Each structure stands twice: as C-alpha cells, then as structure tokens.
C-alpha cells in the first residue's frame, strides 16, 4: 500500500529545513565574516598600543629618537656602525626599541616584510620627516611580497658590505621585540669594537688566496668546492678559500678558533639581537634562504660558524629581554577586546601562521644537518658539516619551487598537503671545468 501523502510532505519539508539551516550556517559562518573582514581590512583597523607596563611612544617621538641616533659623527667611539632591522608588524615595538637604545648609530636599515599598511605608513612618514638622512644614513626598503627573514637579513648584509671595514667593522642585527637594560649596549659596542680589530688584514689575505686559486686550482676532485657564486640559486661566501672548504671537520674547527665572529646581547646562544663581524660574514657567508618564512636560519648560521671554530661573545645575564614569537602573538591585548578591533594584525598573522608550518621547517633542517638523527635538537645527532660535507660549508642552494609552494600555502592558493619538500638533486649541480 502506498504511504500516506502527508508522510511525503513531512520528508520534503525536513529536507528543505536542513538545506535552509545549512545555507544559513554557511552564510553566517563564512560569507558574513568575509564581508566584515573585507570591509574592515579596507579600513585597516588598528590600535597603536604599547606592551603592558611600557609607556606609549608617539610617532613624532619615534622620529625624534631616530634623528638623535643618527645625529652623531660616524667617528664616534661608542657608535653602532650599522643597524639592520627586518620588520613585519612591529609598529609600537620599533618605536620602543629606538627610544630604548641611546647610543649613536651611523647607519640604520629597515627592511619591511609584508603588507601591514600601518607600519608602511609609519616608515613612509619617517622618510619624509628625516628626508635629509634618507639614502645617506637611513635606508628603508619595502617588500610587500614578504621575502622572509633570511632574505631580508641578506639584503641588509649586502648593503652593509658596500661600506669599508673601517666604517662598518660589524653589523648589528636585531628584532624589534627586544629591550636592553641601561649600560648593556654601551658595553656591547665596546667589546665588539675591541674584538674585531685586525680583521681587515685577515680578510685581505684570504681574498688574495682566493684570487690565486683561479690560477692554480686544476683537476680538483669535486669542482663544487672551488665554485663561487653571488647569484641565486647558488650563494657562497666571498672569502672562504678552497683550502679551508676541503678540510676535515677537526682541522676546520681550528681555523678561526682565535677569532670572535658573533656577539650576543643575551647571555646565551639566542639570535634575537646579535652582531656579526665582517670577517665572519666574509667566511661563513649569507643566511640560508631555504628557511622560509622564518625560524631555523639562526641555528643554521651558528652551526656553520661553529664548524669554522669562531668564538662567541656573550653579554651579562639579566640585562636583555625578548618577547618571543611576537609576530605570531602580535596584538594579543587587542584581541582580548574582540578580534574585529584588530583586523590589520589578524589578517597578516593568519597568513604568516599558514606559511610557518613546523613540518616544512623541520624537513629541510633534518635533510641538511640531521639525516641520520632520531631527534633534531641543536646538539644531539647533528652532523659536523651541512649535507654531510657534500657541498662547501658556506654554500647553500635555493629551492625556488619549494619556497613558491610555501608562499602559495600562505596565500591560501595551495593546501598544506601539496607542499613541495626540498629537492636534494639541486646539490648535484654541474660545474664548468674551465
């Protein structure tokens, strides 16, 4: 017997109700927030608030602090020769930083990574207010596409290398989310100046050795160890000779054991704020840009320095503060008052969070330093040389396809599962025997 008509009507009505509820949920949970975020992102809602316990610093006071730091003569004995600071969403932090450091600075380089419009506006207004310093002592570069931390530092280092060793004997590289106790930076500058004396002559001797290599090196077992490049995808240091590149790890560690290469404002190996000597940059090379978008490039650089035997300078404990993961936690206090109050921070931090997926970073780190290790802690199971010594210590080979895949994940163009791991085939590049 056919079911009653009212039974069919109830089933149809239930289907309509479910479809309607699903549609409503979709609109409320996806479309409406998108519209709100779109409208608010156009307005770029933003609150310029200091961290808890810190005094508010206005934009005008920040401009004054920068001008005061740059107003001293470059021969000032207590100066920081070159300040390199990559920034992304560090609006109030950069103001606190430059008003917290009171020593003279000869050159300041801001490299702005990302599309955080409030910060772009601040730096644009800084350039207008300090127009007499721009491209003389003050340099500002914008990368709305976000070239990542390692690439930003490398761009700043290349710029710093345009100055003589006498003018820039070391480069001061810092995050914005750091603070210093009175007297810390003064002592740091004094120690860095003292411990980098005499490096110019050593760089000169190494460069002469490399020039001679071009005439004397023939039929070497692995020509990659005689290869040099300053262009992507293969980057090498300028002044590490073949003789040192091919040494066994035990012998290599002795080469710079009498030399300070890195200086920390912290009392331990922590690269939130540090300085590199010109000799270290010339021999260790540039930061590995395969660590993308951030984190891991610092350990990699320290391990390469350790392989060459460089000494480290540490500051006294208790005088340095770092607010860790500031880019991931930025705007936390405002988020507590409602996420829609902080759209400018939120959209940028979400994109960074998608890109900064831990398995992406650990895959390359393991391949380079821990191919046989069960763990990938700093001092457990790490090989003494990158890629087990198959390429020179100072060399890295950029995998542009891998970087592109991570960027597309950040832009929500690609899913995490479609990530492209680092291609080890890139290390086996051909070298022209001529």
UniProtKB/Swiss-Prot annotation:
GO biological-process terms attached to the record: GPI anchor biosynthetic process
Chain ranges on the Cytoplasmic side, renumbered to this chain? 1-18
Could you say which protein family the record assigns here?
A: Belongs to the glycosyltransferase 2 family.
Q: Which UniProt keywords apply?
A: Endoplasmic reticulum, Glycoprotein, Glycosyltransferase, Membrane, Signal-anchor, Transferase, Transmembrane, Transmembrane helix, Virulence
Per the record, GO CC terms?
Answer: endoplasmic reticulum membrane
Name of the molecule in the record: Galactofuranosyl glycosyltransferase
Topological relation to the membrane, as annotated:
Single-pass type II membrane protein
């Amino acid at each position: 017997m056919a079911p009653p008509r009212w039974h069919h009507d109830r089933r149809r009505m239930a289907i309509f109700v479910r479809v309607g509820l699903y549609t409503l949920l979709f609109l409320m949970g996806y479309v409406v927030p998108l519209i709100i975020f779109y409208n608010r992102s156009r307005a770029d809602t933003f609150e310029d608030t200091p961290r808890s316990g810190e005094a508010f610093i206005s934009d005008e006071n920040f401009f004054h602090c920068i001008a005061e730091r740059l107003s001293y003569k470059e021969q000032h004995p207590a100066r920081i020769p070159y300040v390199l600071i990559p920034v992304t969403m560090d609006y109030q932090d950069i103001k606190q930083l430059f008003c917290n450091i009171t020593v003279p600075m000869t050159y300041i380089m801001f490299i702005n990574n990302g599309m955080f419009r409030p910060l772009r506006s601040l730096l644009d207004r800084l350039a207008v207010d300090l127009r007499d310093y721009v491209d003389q002592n003050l340099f500002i570069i914008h990368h709305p596409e976000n070239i990542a931390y390692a690439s930003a530092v490398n761009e700043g280092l290349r710029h710093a290398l345009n100055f003589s060793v006498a003018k820039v004997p070391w480069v001061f590289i810092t995050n914005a989310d750091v603070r210093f106790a009175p007297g810390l930076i003064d002592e740091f500058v004094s120690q860095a100046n003292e411990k980098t004396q005499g490096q110019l002559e050593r760089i000169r001797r190494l460069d002469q050795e490399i020039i001679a290599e071009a005439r004397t090196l023939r039929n070497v077992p692995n020509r990659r160890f005689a290869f040099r490049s300053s262009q992507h995808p293969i980057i090498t240091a300028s002044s590490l000779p073949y003789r040192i590149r091919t040494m066994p790890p035990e012998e290599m560690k002795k080469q710079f054991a009498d030399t300070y290469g890195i200086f920390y404002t912290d009392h331990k190996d922590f690269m939130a704020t540090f300085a590199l000597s010109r000799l270290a940059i010339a021999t260790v090379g540039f930061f590995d840009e395969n660590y993308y978008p951030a984190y891991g490039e610092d350990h990699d650089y320290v391990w390469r320095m350790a392989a060459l035997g460089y000494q480290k300078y540490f500051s006294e404990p208790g005088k340095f503060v770092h607010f860790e993961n500031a880019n991931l936690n930025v705007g936390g206090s405002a988020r507590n008052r409602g996420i829609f109050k902080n759209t400018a921070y939120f959209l940028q931090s979400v994109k960074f969070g998608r890109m900064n997926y831990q398995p992406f970073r650990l895959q390359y780190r393991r391949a380079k330093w821990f191919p046989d290790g069960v763990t990938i802690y700093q001092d457990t199971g790490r090989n003494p040389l990158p890629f087990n010594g198959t390429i020179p210590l100072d060399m890295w080979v950029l995998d542009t396809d891998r970087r592109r895949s991570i960027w597309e994940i950040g832009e929500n163009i690609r899913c995490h599962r479609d990530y492209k791991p680092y291609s080890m085939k890139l290390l086996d590049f051909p070298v022209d025997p001529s």
